[in-house]
Swiss-Prot record:
One of its GO terms (molecular function) is GTP binding. PROSITE patterns: G_TR_1, G_TR_2. Its EC number is 3.6.5.n1. Belongs to the TRAFAC class translation factor GTPase superfamily. Classic translation factor GTPase family. LepA subfamily. GTP binds at D18, H19, G20, K21, S22, T23, N135, K136, I137, D138. It comes from Pelotomaculum thermopropionicum (strain DSM 13744 / JCM 10971 / SI). Its main location: membrane. Signal peptide: none annotated. One of its GO terms (cellular component) is plasma membrane. Residues 6-188 form the tr-type G domain. It is a peripheral membrane protein. This is Elongation factor 4. It is found in: Cell membrane.
Length: 602
């Protein structure tokens, strides 16, 4: 197909989890003949094993489709698939920056969910043309008219012309493609201007080096060209230029408006940053593209190798993962209990789980993870403000004037029958009610201000179980507020274990400490001496459990005889245990560190 900028359409699909986004992408690929029947598997664009197992999209993927429209002209459509989960909204915002339009996919039975709303607002910020698609119309419980009304009332988009489709059966797919061609504008940009290409993603290939996924905004890029990264100033020679079919396929050149990939023998991971602008070394562009706002990590945890010798391997793996996931942050730290490791920042709990699983699977590492926590702000008596990412770094209580914790604005959508349980859960988690509105006759939208630290444990699971899976949640950071917080330490055999320290609200400290020591008692194996497990706030012990010692029966050989003989043996054993207690080391299994996670409000 001849290149013509006016016949290029760059679009993405936005939807809540499970509204059929990846299946719709499959149908579009199939309809336009991008893949043969043999290559077609379900959820083609979810290429990671993890994505298939969990049934969610984690990484955005790009693919080029060629489509002959009803007007008889050939169009080049670049689809950029996006994730739907709240933790990956950064991936979504990056793919939106590379598009001119978006398909808004809404489940005909479920209606609008919290996540859909958040992504639509992102798309509107980027001035994208939005095409509503009501999916799963073949479900018995589908109610397209109600969903159309919801789209108009809640989002304010005209849904009278929404496409009714079923990604499963393929109904409505041609209509969607026609809408993309007629409604989404062609890309802007100047063909003759110096090259400007936006890196919207990248991954590391052991043979080719860094593979940059780019959207060419101005000019063109071809094999052999000398390019320059505008943020770092480094120069490279392009070795391969290509497109996504969705597998990588070489072409000689990428022109204005096209989406594809570039390799240039970039060996150092830091040289190609996502959001950077690529330009021609000999004829550089005067200003870079706006790029992206930096992702702010919300949740932090420590990652430590089980074997101390794997530290370098972990460092290397994190550097390569960061290339593929720009929202991950990490810095080295040491723990008295766990040795050398990294303090990592994530966008949320699911993001943390995924990164941990990817490190273990893709890089074969064995890891210990400490309990996740948020960033607290501490105003000291000396008048300075410090940010605390690690609970063990909290200053002593005497030096603290007050502590602030991050709050979020949470939007919860649920059927009206579940208003009670949802409000009860939010109150338990120290939530502050802001307002409530009915979206339709049966569905309600609740707005709450909640402490982020209360959300990151099991809030989402609890919300789902109390509403039988019908509620959906979306949240965004809403500044810091002052709270009455204390540090809860865990002492094992009299020693503070820094990796188990957590920062909790004073009202919940006793309950949390009680749960924690009970849980640890079941997880720490018995030793030859007894082990006290204590939870403490400051110098005050608030809960204690004891792991009893394993005792050898020293009286087995004594048959009858004098009681003093037996007492002598028992005293001797007691003295030995006492000595052992002073020098003995307590073995703490990995489960003990994870116990802190699962100590919810039971």
């Amino acid at each position: 197909m001849e290149w013509d900028k006016d016949r290029i359409r760059n679009f993405c699909i936005i939807a809540h989890i499970d509204h059929g986004k990846s299946t719709l992408a499959d149908r579009l690929l199939e309809y336009t003949g991008a893949l043969t029947g043999r290559e077609m598997t379900e959820q083609v664009l979810d290429q990671m094993d993890l994505e298939r197992e969990r049934g969610i999209t984690i990484k955005m993927q790009a693919v080029r489709l060629n489509y002959r429209a009803r007007d008889g002209r050939d169009y080049q459509l670049n689809l950029i698939d996006t994730p739907g989960h709240v933790d990956f909204s950064y991936e979504v915002s990056r793919s939106l920056a590379a598009c001119e339009g978006a398909l808004l996919v809404v489940d005909a039975a479920q209606g609008i969910e919290a996540q859909t709303l958040a992504n639509v607002y992102l798309a509107l910020e980027h001035n994208l043309e939005i095409i509503p698609v009501i999916n799963k119309i073949d479900l018995p419980s589908a109610d397209p008219e109600r969903v159309k009304k919801e789209i108009e009332d809640v989002i304010g988009l005209d849904a009278s012309e929404a496409v009714l489709a079923s990604a499963k059966s393929g109904a409505g797919v041609e209509e969607i493609l026609e809408r993309i061609v007629t409604r989404i504008p062609p890309p802007g940009g100047q063909t003759g201007a110096p090259l400007r290409a936006l890196i919207f993603d990248s991954h590391y290939d052991p043979y080719k080096g860094v593979v940059c996924y780019v959207r060419v905004v101005d000019g063109s890029v071809s094999n052999g060209m000398q390019i320059k990264m505008m943020a770092t100033g480094r120069e490279f020679e392009v070795s391969e230029v290509g497109i996504f079919k969705p597998y990588l396929a070489s072409v000689g050149e990428l022109r204005t408006g096209e989406v594809g990939f570039i390799t240039a023998g970039i060996k150092n991971v830091k040289d190609s940053r996502v959001g950077d602008t690529i330009t021609e070394a000999g004829r550089p562009a005067p200003v870079p593209l706006p790029g992206y706002r930096k992702a702010t990590p919300m949740v932090f945890c420590g990652l430590y190798p089980v074997e101390a010798g794997e530290y370098e391997a972990l460092k290397d793996a994190l550097a390569k993962l960061k290339l593929n996931d720009a929202s991950l942050t990490y810095e080295p730290e040491t723990s008295e209990a766990l040795g050398f490791g990294f303090r990592c920042g994530f966008l949320g709990l699911l993001h943390m789980e995924i990164i941990q699983e990817r490190l273990e699977r893709e890089y074969g590492l064995n890891l210990i993870t400490t309990a996740p926590n948020v960033v607290y702000r501490v105003k000291t008596t000396a008048g300075e403000t410090i940010e605390i990412e690690n609970p063990s770094k909290l200053p002593p209580p005497g030096k603290i004037e007050f502590i602030e914790e991050p709050f979020v604005r949470a939007v919860i959508m649920a059927p009206k029958d579940y208003i009670g349980p949802v409000m009860e859960l939010c109150q338990e988690r120290r939530g502050v009610f802001t307002n409530m509105e009915y979206i339709s006759v049966n569905r309600v939208m609740l707005n709450y201000a909640l402490p982020l630290s209360e959300i990151i444990y099991d809030f989402f699971d609890q919300l789902k179980s109390r509403t039988k899976g019908y509620a959906s949640l979306d949240y965004e950071l809403d500044g810091y507020r002052q709270s009455d917080l204390v540090k809860l330490d865990v002492l094992i055999a009299g020693e503070v274990l820094d990796a188990l320290s957590v920062i909790v609200h004073r009202d919940k400290a006793y309950q949390r400490g009680r749960h924690l020591v009970e849980k640890l008692r079941g997880l720490i194996p018995r030793h030859l001496f007894e082990i006290p497990i204590q939870a403490a706030v400051g110098n005050r012990i608030i809960a204690r459990e004891t792991v009893k010692a394993i005792r050898k029966d020293v009286l087995a050989k004594c048959y009858g005889g004098d009681v003093t003989r037996k007492r002598k043996l028992l005293e001797k054993q007691k003295a030995g245990k006492k000595r052992m207690k002073q020098v003995g080391r307590v073995e703490i299994p990995q489960e003990a560190f994870m116990a802190v996670l699962s100590v919810g409000d039971k």
